[in-house]
């Protein structure tokens, strides 16, 4: 089984490209995913390269930008290529099968969003004497 689920923030704006001859859209970006544990009081993150294909690639490039929170599920894939200097390079990345935009828009300011505050519910007391059971 090869399945990964990640939630993190984009480290820079996604890069949208189209494959020559086929016109298939591909979008590449890096997701910064916080680790569960802190090292010496500092939160650490892993920087995971992601590739998205097709319509999801176009949507990601159009609606997401640096710093936005998103979820990705997909598979881990390793590929190789020959670099300009003649050496063989290996790349490990997540090929996204599903993306979720957890923050929207290219120009909204994420600094004003507080994710640590619980939502307060309006709870109105009910008089139990009117309940028939």
Swiss-Prot record:
This is Single-stranded DNA-binding protein 2. One of its GO terms (cellular component) is nucleoid. Residues 1-103 form the SSB domain. HAMAP family: SSB. The gene is ssb2. PANTHER family: SINGLE-STRANDED DNA-BINDING PROTEIN (PTHR10302:SF27). NCBIfam families: ssb. It comes from the Bacteria. Homotetramer. One of its GO terms (biological process) is DNA replication. It holds the Pfam family SSB. One of its GO terms (molecular function) is single-stranded DNA binding. Keywords: DNA-binding. Transmembrane segments: none annotated. InterPro entries: NA-bd_OB-fold, Primosome_PriB/ssb, ssDNA-bd.
């Amino acid at each position: 089984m090869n399945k990964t689920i990640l939630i993190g923030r984009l480290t820079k704006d996604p890069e949208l490209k189209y494959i020559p001859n086929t016109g298939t859209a591909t979008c590449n970006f890096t997701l910064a995913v916080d680790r569960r544990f802190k090292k010496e009081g500092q939160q650490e993150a892993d920087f995971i390269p992601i590739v998205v294909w097709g319509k999801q690639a176009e949507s990601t490039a159009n609606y997401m930008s640096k710093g936005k929170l998103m979820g990705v599920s997909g598979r881990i894939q390793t590929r190789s290529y020959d670099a300009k200097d003649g050496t063989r390079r290996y790349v490990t990345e997540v090929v996204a099968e599903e993306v979720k935009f957890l923050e929207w828009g290219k120009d909204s300011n994420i600094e004003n969003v507080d994710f640590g505050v619980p939502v307060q519910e309006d709870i109105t007391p009910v008089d139990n004497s009117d309940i028939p059971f």
